[in-house]
């Protein structure tokens, strides 16, 4: 999905020739320590321009380099599950969770089929998150 990082007034995103020229800087040419180098700095991450998931990311601590994690980011902790892609943004997700909690709801079977039996909105999977982050280069 399309996404962007917004640090101050500067936007960083994937290069896309169809997007407005000069709108964003190429995210592949920058490292996090260059654009958010200090503790307490914050920036926004917008994921999926259709659903428009906005995340405020705050640099809470800067750790010394660890040879085990060279070349990719590492998540140290988190809360709750990621909403599924293309669920209609925050309001669509809230609607899904409401349907999920009511087996008598007419859309219950469809929502459960989409989410799968394993989905638990209250569980954050740190190991899975870091496996995904490991693939980012």
Positions of the model-derived regions?
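Short linear regulatory motifs enriched in tryptophan with gly/pro/ser
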Residues: 1-137
